[in-house]
């Protein structure tokens, strides 16, 4: 079908394909209390392909295992090559820190400053590499939990740099630090300000907080 965008007398039609599910939603089983999850920070786990340590054209160039805030070179291939080891631990599922693109200047090794929700970070591998990892894990009776972050994104994300309006992000897209005091949300004695700063404040100055009410 066509998506029609209008700006005054200007019109733009964009063809959009709504693809059918490969599997029915009710056939997909999530993790439960029966599972034992093994949390992996991909950049810190194992370097299976040193050639992708510095992604082509990406902002951060530093790879240094002696620097706690730099990239260390771990990737999807490194995880894939250690699946037998992980399975032997007796776990039933792998929980990966976000693997989507984090094209930030520095300090995004953790994966929580996503700049493209549709692309696996090139320093980890490709979208196809990720799918292959999941298939290989399933062959070893391991589930894979994909960590999705929709509370905030990286400031280099196109959704922030080319936002439709400043209301797309909390505090009109201006940096206001969260208090991290989430208990105030349920505290009957907390002020409206305390609750707002806890839920709407930014995680860091380079992780703008999405306005979920928009």
Predicted regions and their residues:
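Extended acidic/polar, glycine-enriched regions
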Residues: 1-30
């Amino acid at each position: 079908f066509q998506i029609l965008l209008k700006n005054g007398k200007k019109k733009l039609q964009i063809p959009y394909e709504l693809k059918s599910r490969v599997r029915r939603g009710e056939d997909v089983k999530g993790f439960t209390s029966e599972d034992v999850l093994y949390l992996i920070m991909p950049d810190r786990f194992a370097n299976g392909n040193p050639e992708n340590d510095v992604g082509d054209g990406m902002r951060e160039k530093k790879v240094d295992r002696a620097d706690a805030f730099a990239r260390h070179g771990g990737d999807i291939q490194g995880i894939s090559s250690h699946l037998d080891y992980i399975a032997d631990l007796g776990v039933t599922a792998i929980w990966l820190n976000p693997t989507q693109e984090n094209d930030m200047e520095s300090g995004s090794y953790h994966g929580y400053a996503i700049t493209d929700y549709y692309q696996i970070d090139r320093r980890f591998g490709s979208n196809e590499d990720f799918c292959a990892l999941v298939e290989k894990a399933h062959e070893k009776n391991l589930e894979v939990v994909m960590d999705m972050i929709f509370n905030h994104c990286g400031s280099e994300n196109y959704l922030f740099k080319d936002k439709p309006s400043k209301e797309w992000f909390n505090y009109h897209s201006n940096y206001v630090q969260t208090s991290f005091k989430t208990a105030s949300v349920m505290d009957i004695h907390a002020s409206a300000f305390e609750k707002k700063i806890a839920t709407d404040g930014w995680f860091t100055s380079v992780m703008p907080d999405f306005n979920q009410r928009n």
